[in-house]
Amino acid sequence: MELNISESRSRSIRCIVKLGGAAITCKNELEKIHDENLEVVACQLRQAMLEGSAPSKVIGMDWSKRPGSSEISCDVDDIGDQKSSEFSKFVVVHGAGSFGHFQASRSGVHKGGLEKPIVKAGFVATRISVTNLNLEIVRALAREGIPTIGMSPFSCGWSTSKRDVASADLATVAKTIDSGFVPVLHGDAVLDNILGCTILSGDVIIRHLADHLKPEYVVFLTDVLGVYDRPPSPSEPDAVLLKEIAVGEDGSWKVVNPLLEHTDKKVDYSVAAHDTTGGMETKISEAAMIAKLGVDVYIVKAATTHSQRALNGDLRDSVPEDWLGTIIRFSK
């Protein structure tokens, strides 16, 4: 795999955060952002990035018109000589949710075949959709004073070979971090050396970022409390939250809390028909590979007190009994 990454790459990365598409968009409404959740997530990220620093005035960085507004919100007159906030180093990656998946699944982009007009059109349509979402997430975080920079994998030189990452410009990501910005990447339609094209999921992107940037911990923000032994729903009221999953040296994993025999490697996955990225099964698989690197992974419901504690890094030494989520960590 070709990785463009300089020797002076950014070290001391504190956290990589995955914003699950289902948590920040309305899954049953095409291209609809869950504004309330996204606003809370942006606020929680700001608090986590300040790492115990005294709260400072939020200097919004989105100086563009918003839909339904006739004015531009610009805090430039308030900035003056004010000392900038010292944010710890975070990277954000988000999924597509109700953006992109519809276009990709209807056209078969994930299967490849750019010579087909429907696939080529779907490739364009998918990228329009996911880059629109990326812009709105960048704007939401910027309104919280977080210096975000949207970075699309396709435009940054990411490509695949039979769906495995073949090249990635990680040097640009590292330089962006070292310059004091927060990169915001996303799942994207990319070129594939064998298939012609495919979908590169945000979960796969995070694994490669974690491998080369070596964060202290990784947080997956989802629309459920964590990983269950079966999809939680009104028809499955007895679904069990798996609080800790241990990953072995060979990459295999097992549930260690709670100690339920039937959960070991027998988790029942549920994937929506339009989801071209593999759903929870892919998430656990990629999280296990990250944990194998010695990096703890927390899967937790977005916009909750549980997600704030995970983002803050409060769980690294000990996990309170009242914390709800799933921890995936390496176990020798």
Curated annotation (Swiss-Prot):
Compartments reported by the entry: Cytoplasm, Cytosol
Q: Which CDD domains does the protein's record reference?
A: AAK_FomA-like
- Keyword Nucleotide-binding present in the record's keywords: the answer is yes
Q: Which domain of life is it from?
A: Eukaryota
Q: State what this protein does.
A: Catalyzes the formation of isopentenyl diphosphate (IPP), the universal five-carbon isoprenoid building block of all natural isoprenoids. Acts in parallel with the mevalonate (MVA) pathway and plays an important role in regulating the formation of both MVA and methylerythritol phosphate (MEP) pathway-derived terpenoid compounds by controlling the ratio of isopentenyl phosphate (IP) and dimethylallyl phosphate (DMAP) to isopentenyl diphosphate (IPP) and dimethylallyl diphosphate (DMAPP). Controls the levels of IP and DMAP that are competitive inhibitors of the farnesyl diphosphate synthase.
Family as reported in the entry's similarity comment: Belongs to the isopentenyl phosphate kinase family.
This protein's name: Isopentenyl phosphate kinase
